[in-house]
Amino acid sequence: MAARVLIIGSGGREHTLAWKLAQSHHVKQVLVAPGNAGTACSEKISNTAISISDHTALAQFCKEKKIEFVVVGPEAPLAAGIVGNLRSAGVQCFGPTAEAAQLESSKRFAKEFMDRHGIPTAQWKAFTKPEEACSFILSADFPALVVKASGLAAGKGVIVAKSKEEACKAVQEIMQEKAFGAAGETIVIEELLDGEEVSCLCFTDGKTVAPMPPAQDHKRLLEGDGGPNTGGMGAYCPAPQVSNDLLLKIKDTVLQRTVDGMQQEGTPYTGILYAGIMLTKNGPKVLEFNCRFGDPECQVILPLLKSDLYEVIQSTLDGLLCTSLPVWLENHTALTVVMASKGYPGDYTKGVEITGFPEAQALGLEVFHAGTALKNGKVVTHGGRVLAVTAIRENLISALEEAKKGLAAIKFEGAIYRKDVGFRAIAFLQQPRSLTYKESGVDIAAGNMLVKKIQPLAKATSRSGCKVDLGGFAGLFDLKAAGFKDPLLASGTDGVGTKLKIAQLCNKHDTIGQDLVAMCVNDILAQGAEPLFFLDYFSCGKLDLSVTEAVVAGIAKACGKAGCALLGGETAEMPDMYPPGEYDLAGFAVGAMERDQKLPHLERITEGDVVVGIASSGLHSNGFSLVRKIVAKSSLQYSSPAPDGCGDQTLGDLLLTPTRIYSHSLLPVLRSGHVKAFAHITGGGLLENIPRVLPEKLGVDLDAQTWRIPRVFSWLQQEGHLSEEEMARTFNCGVGAVLVVSKEQTEQILRDIQQHKEEAWVIGSVVARAEGSPRVKVKNLIESMQINGSVLKNGSLTNHFSFEKKKARVAVLISGTGSNLQALIDSTREPNSSAQIDIVISNKAAVAGLDKAERAGIPTRVINHKLYKNRVEFDSAIDLVLEEFSIDIVCLAGFMRILSGPFVQKWNGKMLNIHPSLLPSFKGSNAHEQALETGVTVTGCTVHFVAEDVDAGQIILQEAVPVKRGDTVATLSERVKLAEHKIFPAALQLVASGTVQLGENGKICWVKEE
């Protein structure tokens, strides 16, 4: 692709924007209106004289020049409504509307907005009468020394007074002497804040906020921050005074809160949001908002952008910034120094020749023009701030030294510039500061807060033998106080495995703690041990208090169910060890039993003993790597409704059903002396856990028809096409634990178990096994799952979900309303449908077809064709999504792109399109016009396989439609659409069911007649 973009403005900011956009392979030309000498004539960049104040003429110019989008640099056009006017004319424009730009154009509006939305800012009051303003300055209970013109004043409308008298004088200058014209008709008197000022900018599409690295500007003309205010004499980025944690706080409390507030007030804000922030001892506070890049901040921020600026802007315009978040160059600093004309910010001379550009560029520096012009082939001064020299180096001091070399190379008479840009950061970095543990990523205060929150939860698990009191070096347990006489100790440790991944994806952390406790206490129960106390280990990269508290609360609750004390634990915050949002868990259980109650009694187990199965609650905590793989290949998301028969819950909730804890209910049964062995069915499933409690040369035969198998296992088996052995070796298949008992004691044991509210069955028997033969055999497992996945109708079993014929997975490609999409959705929702729509892909954002898909719960993707160099690249991006969703058939429903040959060949015989005529008549995009012009009395529509030649593929179905007297294109189109809604779904069903195929000879083949 080769796009043309237009930038509005003439300063250093606009030159920087043009320079960065020209680096994109998507861009063939950058036009700048009106531009300067730096944007006049480079390889991709040139100026245009089009008026930027006549928005109607500008819109027409954009259409004639095929401008992809317009980027507005300065604030005045934004306040004048350029964005809304261009968008109304059908031209994409990057920036906020005039209504949203009031954040900058009206200081009063901005302050009132911040107050409404709780955005931290200085105390203030607005005035339209100078005497009232002065009275307020003199009587305020805070230093009311900042006087601001409420309107736009080219960045110079702020006066910071040193005394109340000076502040009153500033009021007179602004309001009576009209120092800033109409901008000063309303003024804002503000509290003087103490601290350092930084610039925090972000991209935003009205929802997502993508912060840029923080920068610091230098407003004063002279070194040491002396002299008058200017538009900015230099900047550097990133500002080390803003830590990552502080930037995140500014993002949440200022940038995101502002964007959310504008959305709530019905004025969505898109483009660049710039917050001038004062770093006070009470936290960051907003000094002002700007609605565009700062100048000269732009000259140090964009050089650090690694991403393609064109793609970032396009995704912002499309409302998809979250899919194209900018990436920034790390471990580098950009520093820029502005060279200004003699006399600036007052009167200055224009037309002074500038030399030395080649020498500066030879040093590896970027020179961004601002107030420059071309005169007789020479670059001359044409403004107060003339240009900026930018250096990008590994550190701030190196960048400043390199920039100074460029300043020495570039010469023009009377040039003034500062040599101390970055002095505050250098002083900050040179301060003797000891590194804190928190700066390295470990927040001890947050850890202490967590302990306070979980202490009462742990304390509630105290039991005989143990009084829980967190905070010591170790916990104690008194076996004698717990009633033991001659005890043995048993210990077990376990984790939760990749079930954690699902909990983290579903943001559901309150039940995973029970899984951890259950896995440990059920293991020691196999020794006959009563769980006494439990210890947990929680590790993460960054401590999230709410998540960690939810997990530990779940652990404490589970300890209560198990009858053990949560005696202690470890919360390990380890920066860089885990990605954001991820954590890991491990648990340790210690239990005890009297010496004569130890299990298993291997010497007592004999051939003919009975195997009793105890019901599981579901998957428990094993096999989740396989589960996640199956879900990824299925048509369901974790947020989808669970499969039929699995309850009114999401798939994620179903899979996260916590592991059953057996200690409280089964311990009395185990202590009866009638149980010979207990096996916890954990990793390794039925096949590998039961042999762990059997003597050599003995095994078990199990019959799956004797127990209830939860339907989730049937769904997993069907979706994953899992073998009987794979199911039995991976999952518990509905049996969470197994007891081995004698035949004589079986009925009593079953009664005892059921008394304790557990579901149990006789599921098999102990048998002799020859050496080398399988220790566990399970019969009827797959058959039981088939029945389990079925329902009884009219006395016979019919498939419910598990073994119905697999439906063809369909992708629908659209460009707009997707006129046939709804008909396809409705058809595939029918119970006997042979197809299911798994993904809808659009090459345009925010179109009606996407809304239809989302309402139907179908995943959507937007793949913007404008971001790709050619059709093949674009089609390859689509193909990746089709592979991701394991698509079988592609339907084109109003997809307005011509597909490339390789893509069509790959999907030959698997891609359908519909055309609004009876092909081969009236091919092309104006079929209805052709039908009306030729005077035919019958037209219609055709569903066909897609071929490389347009509308030339093999015909699957056709439907005739009469052409009536007096028909127009509109009336005929509506009548044909009704026929399309009928035959497109029908054709899809024919192909999905295998009734119609494209034969090897390239002709339609009817495999069977319906």
UniProtKB/Swiss-Prot annotation:
InterPro entries: ATP-grasp, ATP_grasp_subdomain_1, Formyl_transf_N, Formyl_transf_N_sf, GART, GART_AS, PreATP-grasp_dom_sf, PRibGlycinamid_synth_ATP-grasp
Modified residues (Phosphoserine): S10, S440, S796, S802
EC number(s) given by UniProt: 6.3.4.13, 6.3.3.1, 2.1.2.2
Pathway where it operates: Purine metabolism; IMP biosynthesis via de novo pathway; 5-amino-1-(5-phospho-D-ribosyl)imidazole from N(2)-formyl-N(1)-(5-phospho-D-ribosyl)glycinamide: step 2/2; Purine metabolism; IMP biosynthesis via de novo pathway; N(1)-(5-phospho-D-ribosyl)glycinamide from 5-phospho-alpha-D-ribose 1-diphosphate: step 2/2; Purine metabolism; IMP biosynthesis via de novo pathway; N(2)-formyl-N(1)-(5-phospho-D-ribosyl)glycinamide from N(1)-(5-phospho-D-ribosyl)glycinamide (10-formyl THF route): step 1/1
UniProt modified residues of type N-acetylalanine: A2
Gene (UniProt): GART
GO cellular component: cytosol; extracellular exosome
Protein name, entry field: Trifunctional purine biosynthetic protein adenosine-3
Quaternary structure (record): Homodimer.
Gene3D superfamilies recorded: 3.40.50.20, ATP-grasp fold, A domain (3.30.1490.20), ATP-grasp fold, B domain (3.30.470.20), Formyl transferase, N-terminal domain (3.40.50.170), Phosphoribosylglycinamide synthetase, C-terminal domain (3.90.600.10), PurM-like C-terminal domain (3.90.650.10), PurM-like, N-terminal domain (3.30.1330.10)
Details of cofactor binding: Binds 1 magnesium or manganese ion per subunit.
Catalytic reaction list: 5-phospho-beta-D-ribosylamine + glycine + ATP = N(1)-(5-phospho-beta-D-ribosyl)glycinamide + ADP + phosphate + H(+); N(1)-(5-phospho-beta-D-ribosyl)glycinamide + (6R)-10-formyltetrahydrofolate = N(2)-formyl-N(1)-(5-phospho-beta-D-ribosyl)glycinamide + (6S)-5,6,7,8-tetrahydrofolate + H(+); 2-formamido-N(1)-(5-O-phospho-beta-D-ribosyl)acetamidine + ATP = 5-amino-1-(5-phospho-beta-D-ribosyl)imidazole + ADP + phosphate + H(+)
